[in-house]
């Protein structure tokens, strides 16, 4: 890896420090096929952002842009029947009465009223006038509909609208909802599902890796607003009437395209399959009711950029370790930690012994790093969605002792002083760099993103890992005695501009003066006689 690239990566890392929980990819059980490691056993497995050879699908999906209740615009719609009754006797004595009756109203009648009001076709409300007849009772009635705006809440988990006017306070989302009043219903202003989609969801592109034409537990999903996540531990959850997948990290997405989806290796079309068939192979269970979806925070962009930088940086550090092994140099525990994979799945595990390094194959998962000492040394707990199954304790039984007296576990993990389980690369893999950089490196960072004082070549100096005197110099700025004192720097810059401008003006005046002098000498004097 070029020194310039290393420096640039470290600069990006230092600028985007973001502390997360200690979640690492670790082996969940010990292999049964240990063997002495040879040079060919030291390999690097690329992370999701680097694995360009893997097959994947890109498709449109809905993702949450907000959680909790949304607002659905609508109307309360009421229908009344106005009746006029005219009663006469044989002497033609007339009696007229009026009364109003509440009657049931349909959604169609409500929408007709909404359209009429919008078009200005207003109907004047008044009692009808019946034609009275001798010695008879005649009635005439006319129906009038009233509408008034009424926005209601919406619960995306139950797909119901919420209002005190509804019986029980809720109504399953549909074209019309009854209220506690027999003659009043609620109708949405526009199709409710459209309002819900616009309020809760954004449409984006997602990428999902596939193996053997299937989405498997080791498949990864990522997108413009989806944190890279493994599919294992996901469950099915319907939000806003949209069937989707809740990832282990709490993010939710729903595929928009239900037809054929292209499977691509390196961007070329290979074969087509439907998303339904792909995802059904996972046999996902339904999520627990208590499991809630999350929306990426404002830190998401920083985290995703940082994770990509870390994947690239870790991959190249791993390549350096492989080159070190193939050149016959001794490997350290930190080297073994760099060889560990960054994504779940089956991969090599390395363990230091008194005779060298041994290697085996095992399964890796994302775990919460919570080491505890005891008869069974615990590394941590598996990360699973709450409600699906209990977290599993990850233990490492067989620890090997080396000549330095330390007990060694998987991938460079060791027990220090018989009291503490130490991950040599934890600060790197868990993105907790701030303390690591301060304690292990002396860093020089540009206080502002300026380039005028940075030399053209960016390179690290004395780049070593470990040791009290080791450090990484991010870049080599052109230093002046006023560097770091901003008001002096500004004054010097302004003074420099004034001096240059004055010099240019003076040069211009000098040129003009010389030109004028030359012209005056060459011009003949008036009335002068030439001999």
From Swiss-Prot:
Top-level lineage group: Viruses
Protein's GO biological process: clathrin-dependent endocytosis of virus by host cell; fusion of virus membrane with host endosome membrane; virion attachment to host cell
Gene3D superfamilies tied to this protein: 6.10.140.740
Its biological purpose: Attaches the virus to host receptors, inducing clathrin-dependent endocytosis of the virion.
The species this protein was found in: Tupaia virus (isolate Tupaia/Thailand/-/1986)
Name the record gives this protein: Glycoprotein
Stretches that traverse the bilayer: 493-513
InterPro entries on file: Rhabdo_glycop_CD, Rhabdo_glycop_FD
Compartments where found: Virion membrane; Host membrane
Keywords: Clathrin-mediated endocytosis of virus by host, Disulfide bond, Fusion of virus membrane with host endosomal membrane, Fusion of virus membrane with host membrane, Glycoprotein, Host membrane, Host-virus interaction, Lipoprotein, Membrane, Palmitate, Signal, Transmembrane, Transmembrane helix, Viral attachment to host cell, Viral envelope protein, Viral penetration into host cytoplasm, Virion, Virus endocytosis by host, Virus entry into host cell
Sequence ranges on the Virion surface membrane side: 22-492
Membrane topology label: Single-pass type I membrane protein
Self-association state and partner proteins as the record states: Homotrimer.
PTM statement from Swiss-Prot or TrEMBL: Glycosylated by host.
Intravirion-facing ranges: 514-531
GO CC term (a single one): membrane
Location, primary (coarse class): virion
Family stated for the protein in its record: Belongs to the vesiculovirus glycoprotein family.
């Amino acid at each position: 890896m070029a020194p310039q690239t290393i420096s640039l990566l470290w600069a990006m890392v230092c600028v985007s420090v973001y502390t997360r929980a200690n979640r690492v990819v670790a082996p969940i059980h010990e292999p049964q096929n240990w063997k002495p490691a040879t040079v060919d056993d030291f390999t690097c497995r690329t992370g999701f952002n680097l694995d360009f050879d893997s097959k994947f699908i890109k498709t449109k999906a809905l993702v949450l842009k907000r959680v909790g209740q949304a607002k659905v615009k609508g109307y309360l719609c009421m229908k009344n029947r106005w009746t006029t009754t005219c009663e006469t006797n044989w002497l033609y004595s007339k009696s007229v009465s009026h009364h109003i009756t509440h009657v049931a109203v349909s959604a169609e009648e409500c929408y007709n009223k909404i359209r009429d009001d919008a078009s200005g076709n207003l109907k004047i409300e008044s009692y009808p006038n019946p034609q009275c007849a001798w010695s008879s009772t005649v009635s005439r009635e006319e129906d009038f509909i009233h509408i008034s705006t009424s926005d209601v809440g919406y619960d995306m988990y139950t797909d119901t609208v919420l209002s005190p006017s509804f019986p029980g306070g809720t109504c399953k989302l549909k074209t019309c909802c009854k209220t506690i009043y027999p003659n009043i219903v609620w109708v949405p202003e526009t199709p409710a599902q459209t309002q819900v989609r616009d309020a809760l969801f954004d449409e984006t592109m997602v990428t999902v890796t596939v193996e053997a034409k299937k989405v498997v537990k080791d498949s990864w999903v990522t997108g413009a607003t989806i944190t890279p996540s493994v599919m294992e531990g996901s469950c099915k959850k319907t939000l806003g009437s949209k069937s989707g997948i809740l990832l282990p990290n709490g993010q939710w997405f729903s595929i928009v395209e239900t037809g054929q989806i292209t499977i691509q290796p390196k961007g070329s079309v290979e074969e087509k399959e439907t998303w339904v068939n792909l995802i059904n192979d996972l046999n996902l269970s339904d999520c627990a009711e208590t499991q809630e979806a999350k929306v990426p925070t404002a830190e998401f962009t920083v985290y995703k950029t940082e994770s990509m930088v870390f994947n690239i940086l870790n991959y190249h550090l791993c390549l350096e370790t492989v080159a070190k092994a193939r050149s016959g140099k001794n490997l350290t525990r930190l080297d073994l930690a760099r060889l560990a994979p960054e994504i779940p799945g089956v991969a090599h595990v390395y363990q230091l012994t008194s005779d060298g390094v041994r290697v085996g194959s095992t399964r890796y998962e994302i775990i919460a790093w919570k080491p505890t000492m005891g008869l069974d040394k615990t590394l941590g707990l598996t990360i699973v969605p709450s409600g699906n199954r209990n977290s599993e304790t990850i233990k490492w039984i067989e620890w090997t002792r080396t000549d330095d007296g330390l007990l060694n576990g998987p991938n460079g993990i060791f027990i220090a002083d018989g009291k503490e389980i130490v991950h040599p690369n934890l600060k790197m893999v868990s993105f907790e760099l701030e303390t690591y950089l301060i304690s292990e490196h002396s860093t020089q960072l540009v206080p502002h993103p300026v380039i005028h004082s940075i030399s053209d070549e960016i390179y690290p100096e004395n780049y070593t890992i470990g040791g009290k005197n080791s450090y990484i110099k991010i870049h080599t700025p052109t230093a002046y005695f006023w560097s770091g004192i901003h008001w002096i720097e500004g004054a010097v810059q302004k003074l420099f501009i004034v001096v240059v401008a004055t010099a240019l003006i003076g040069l211009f005046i000098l040129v003009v003066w010389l030109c004028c002098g030359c012209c005056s000498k060459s011009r003949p004097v008036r009335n002068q006689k030439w001999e």
